[in-house]
Amino acid sequence: MRIQWIVRAASIVVLMLGVGAAKEIEPEAPDQPPAAHPAREDPLARSAPKTLARGAYVSVQVNVDALGFNILGDAANEPSIAVNPLNPANMVIAWRQFDSVSSNFRQGGWAYTFDAGRHWTFPGVLTPGTFRSDPVVDVDAQGVFYYQSLKGNFLMDTFMSTNGGVSWGAPVASYGGDKNWLVVDRTGGIGDGNLYGIWQRFAACCGTNVLTRSVTGGTTWQTPVPVAKWPTFGTLAVGPDGTLFAAGVDGTTSQNFNVFVVARSKDAKDPGVTPTFDGRVVEMGGYMQLGGGPNPGGLLGQGNVAVDH
């Protein structure tokens, strides 16, 4: 029987719609100090890793020690995953790492695999001791991974890995704001290799300018520009012709959790042109949900957009 492997962290990001009233989400900022994590250095503070089988599919815990065991006392959520297009057995996952459940201080955790998710290596966190949230990872057509995260000052860093996620280069300042998202153009067209970062405008660096672009492989980032309808708490996607799409809830005047929007840029792919956008409201029904388990201090999902290729 062929076994399909599913990787698992502490939460799954989906478009969550339901019945309820919209409410404001608090921006991310450190409010508790880091907590000691003695269990990480104690080989006895371990338990069997969590696995779950459902038919031919098996989920595998990724935030494990060097021997594949669960580390007691820590936690993780808000995972993001990317697959190397040149070697699908190579994947990278990013998440918010809580070294101790006694503190909500989070850092940038990650793990990588070279055997299609059967085994994972969790080396630690990026720039230890730095408050990091909203991690997003993506990969370009050449197999270079990019990891973007939000710091406590509402500015983002972007890291680059040329060895499959084993190690990362120095952080590159990338403007930013709360609940950021990242996408890389892998179309092979004029915009191939472009990186795009977006965020909400209510806890951010640059007012109503909420999207930045890199045309230099993430080494530099351009001055942010506005996006029609200001999609909030959503994601990005690149179409086969390089058209850039952004989706989320309407951020025109406030965080309208019951109004969903999609914005589109046909010229963002052109490195010599400042991106412009048009946008529209789309009827999805219901509300994006906030609070409650498993993430009582954050979103229960995001607005997701995807394009067929």
Regions found by a protein language model. Name each.
Residues 2-10:
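Bacterial N-terminal signal peptides that target proteins for export
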Residues 9-18:
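Bacterial N-terminal signal peptides
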Residues 23-309:
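C-terminal PAP-associated
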